[in-house]
UniProtKB/Swiss-Prot annotation:
The gene is rpsU. Keywords: Ribonucleoprotein, Ribosomal protein. Residues 44-62 have a biased composition (Basic residues). Residues 43-62 are annotated as: Disordered. PANTHER family: MITOCHONDRIAL 28S RIBOSOMAL PROTEIN S21, SMALL RIBOSOMAL SUBUNIT PROTEIN BS21M. This is Small ribosomal subunit protein bS21. GO terms for cellular component: ribonucleoprotein complex; ribosome.
Length: 62
């Protein structure tokens, strides 16, 4: 869990920037987007197969 403690003379803007930086470093948004909707096992397999195809296509270029 990400948490930001406001300093004595710290503004809200700088604390918000720190919070956003911590959230992006923790990788919360991609995880949140991934779990937004339930993904059936078939959808998982399709997604992984598509990712594997993309990866193979990229590797074959070089």
């Amino acid at each position: 869990m990400t948490q930001v403690i406001l300093g004595e003379n710290e503004g809200i803007e700088s604390a918000l920037r720190r919070f956003k930086r911590q959230v992006s470093q923790a990788g919360i948004f991609p995880d949140m987007k991934k779990h937004r909707h339930f993904e059936t096992p078939i959808e998982k397999r399709k997604r992984k197969a598509m990712a594997l195809q993309k990866q193979r296509k990229r590797r074959s270029r070089y």
